[in-house]
């Protein structure tokens, strides 16, 4: 299942969050259509800006749009002219007041959408698809990612029949829900047709919401537990040994040694009463 489904939708509420955050009852379909139009407008004319994702939040009379980009200078423009133009287009599209936030992506080498876009740009420039894939994989692994997988599908190298090829380096656990797997997709337009580029980047495990809340509560109380488990872990192992049917001689051996351990306590009764108190 994890091999087929979109990693973002597969992990919603666990390691990823919604890209559109609003509630609507009767206007739900209109808002969904509006969100699609906003994202299409922002990504169609700004291929050079390196837009990673667009987040949308709505209130009753205002729309907040967050643009995550690797090159914020291109989106803002000279003295903010381009940003004002985008804000005017969004207000005309939505009919509401728009709050536009332009956020810089700190590490574009580990952003799956930007990596897919970079590979697609090289394919459009007639670079060999294998060279483009390996170059992007090397840059991502040097940037600190734990694993990456890149897949290209289409008429690779101008072949008559379309096919798909992928390269993988490191670990990419698609079935593990706690794994922080970023996913990106972009299409390269070539003279032979379109080539789809898919990128999966594994950045490490992320704790789920329940574990984070429990850890925060323990930190406030001042008794944060150790990660390895509590003191009752050896006892659990002993019970498991009994269930598996260990020999009775192994269980009776500690009981035979118990009186030897109690001998010093009998010789010094004053000390034993002090410890009991």
Swiss-Prot record:
Regions that span the bilayer: none
Gene3D superfamilies linked: 3.30.300.20, Ribosomal protein S3, C-terminal domain (3.30.1140.32)
Listed GO MF terms: mRNA binding; rRNA binding; structural constituent of ribosome
Basic and acidic residues: bias regions: 233-243
InterPro entries listed in its UniProt record: KH_dom (IPR004087), KH_dom-like_a/b (IPR015946), KH_dom_type_2 (IPR004044), KH_sf_prok-type (IPR009019), Ribosomal_S3_C_sf (IPR036419), Ribosomal_uS3_bac-typ (IPR005704), Ribosomal_uS3_C (IPR001351), Ribosomal_uS3_CS (IPR018280)
Keywords: Ribonucleoprotein, Ribosomal protein, RNA-binding, rRNA-binding
Bias kind Low complexity: ranges: 216-226, 253-271
Pfam family, one: Ribosomal_S3_C
CDD domains membership: KH-II_30S_S3
Keyword set includes Protein biosynthesis: no
Domain KH type-2 residues, every copy: 38-106
Disordered: region residues: 216-277
GO cellular component, one term: cytosolic small ribosomal subunit
GO biological process assignments: translation
Subunit structure: Part of the 30S ribosomal subunit. Forms a tight complex with proteins S10 and S14.
Function: Binds the lower part of the 30S subunit head. Binds mRNA in the 70S ribosome, positioning it for translation.
Record family assignment: Belongs to the universal ribosomal protein uS3 family.
Cited NCBIfam families: rpsC_bact
Protein name: Small ribosomal subunit protein uS3
Organism: Streptomyces coelicolor (strain ATCC BAA-471 / A3(2) / M145)
